[in-house]
């Protein structure tokens, strides 16, 4: 494998994980904060809010997992090598 392609693959893998985790991390923090605020305002709606929150967090976490999969492909099954 060309050293330039190997180095670019490692940098791209790091960016895929790093940038792929920033957005969902911020989104999860905002969603959790709003859920806590909503439960504090309407405690009787806790079950509905919690269920929606968990589903939303799962979808946001999927984006991070996609970034991890892309980085693993670039590191171990590099299509450019």
UniProtKB/Swiss-Prot annotation:
Name the predominant localization. membrane
InterPro entries xrefs? ATP_synth_csu_bac/chlpt (IPR005953), ATP_synth_F0_csu (IPR000454), ATP_synth_F0_csu_DDCD_BS (IPR020537), ATP_synth_F0_csu_sf (IPR038662), ATPase_proteolipid_c-like_dom (IPR002379), F/V-ATP_Csub_sf (IPR035921)
Q: Which GO terms describe its cellular component?
A: plasma membrane-derived thylakoid membrane; proton-transporting ATP synthase complex; proton-transporting two-sector ATPase complex, proton-transporting domain
| SUPFAM superfamilies named in the record | F1F0 ATP synthase subunit C
GO terms of molecular function: lipid binding; proton-transporting ATP synthase activity, rotational mechanism
**Gene3D superfamilies noted in UniProt:** F1F0 ATP synthase subunit C
Q: Does the keyword Transport apply?
A: yes
Site keyed Reversibly protonated during proton transport: positions: 61
Q: Which Pfam families match?
A: ATP-synt_C
Task: Identify the domain of life.
Answer: Bacteria
Keyword Membrane present in the record's keywords: the answer is yes
Topology in the lipid bilayer is annotated as: Multi-pass membrane protein
Keywords (alphabetical) are:
ATP synthesis, CF(0), Hydrogen ion transport, Ion transport, Lipid-binding, Membrane, Thylakoid, Transmembrane, Transmembrane helix, Transport
The function of this protein is:
F(1)F(0) ATP synthase produces ATP from ADP in the presence of a proton or sodium gradient. F-type ATPases consist of two structural domains, F(1) containing the extramembraneous catalytic core and F(0) containing the membrane proton channel, linked together by a central stalk and a peripheral stalk. During catalysis, ATP synthesis in the catalytic domain of F(1) is coupled via a rotary mechanism of the central stalk subunits to proton translocation. Key component of the F(0) channel; it plays a direct role in translocation across the membrane. A homomeric c-ring of between 10-14 subunits forms the central stalk rotor element with the F(1) delta and epsilon subunits.
* Record family assignment: Belongs to the ATPase C chain family.
Specify the protein name: ATP synthase subunit c
Q: Which organism is it from?
A: Trichodesmium erythraeum (strain IMS101)
Which lineage do the record's taxonomy fields give for this organism?
Bacteria, Bacillati, Cyanobacteriota, Cyanophyceae, Oscillatoriophycideae
């Amino acid at each position: 494998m060309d050293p330039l392609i190997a180095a670019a693959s490692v940098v791209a893998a790091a960016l895929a994980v790093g940038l792929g985790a920033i957005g969902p991390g911020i989104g999860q923090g905002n969603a959790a904060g709003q859920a806590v605020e909503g439960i504090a305002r309407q405690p009787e709606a806790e079950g509905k809010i919690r269920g929606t929150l968990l589903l939303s967090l799962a979808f946001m976490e999927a984006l991070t997992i996609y970034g991890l999969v892309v980085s693993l492909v670039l590191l171990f099954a590099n299509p450019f090598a």
